[in-house]
């Protein structure tokens, strides 16, 4: 007989800081689940969790755009210099970081303002992000009933039953977005966020997840899409596998790499399509 899993009640927290949310080790997020599966592995996930990375300046533009679109996030500090080469510019930048602000050069501030304006003008994204008609960055916690793992999500914007996820990207062309969904396993995020919102009782008739991708290159074009049902099902199946892996690792204290425990050296080859192509060319 399978042992009963203790299920803690769902919880919705308003006003929780991003730092506190990401530092929580009693639950797992969508990015954590994705990191457990190939090309990641449990060993790398655990190391990264135990050794948080310092702030990455390359994320500042994305965070600033999120603030202007969602109305939530650290305050912006405009640094009136053309670049960061001057010592005074670097000093002002570092002081802004110490004050928990996002430092932006004037040109970058103008850029994110233009990006936010493009969102507001967009016929689909604009209405989705209408101020006062949604909630930004609520923290939602629930327990996976199959494994007992405590889970968490933090939707960018929740408008009724619609989860709106805003992402900046170098190129928002649909083909590029499609590859990004595959490369970053955003189909797992889609399924996980829908499950979290529904588990918390925020969408009694079912939740929807909408991606809003915006190019970081002028004129800051936007692609709004919903995931196919099949890809969402794949994402949910990947989440289920990752949850089982996580529960096992937490229970045993063993966090394996890609190979896992073996009694002999495994084989490896080229990607299958390369093997087929070269076999056809050289072995026939």
Predicted regions and their residues:
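Compositionally biased, intrinsically disordered low-complexity regions enriched in proline and serine
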Residues: 22-23, 46-48, 98, 167, ...
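Generic detection of intrinsically disordered/low-complexity segments and helix-coil linkers/edges
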Residues: 15, 39, 78, 91, ...
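Metal-dependent nuclease catalytic cores that hydrolyze phosphodiester bonds in DNA/RNA
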Residues: 1-152, 259-260
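Metal-dependent nuclease catalytic regions and adjoining charged, substrate-binding loops involved
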Residues: 9, 192-284
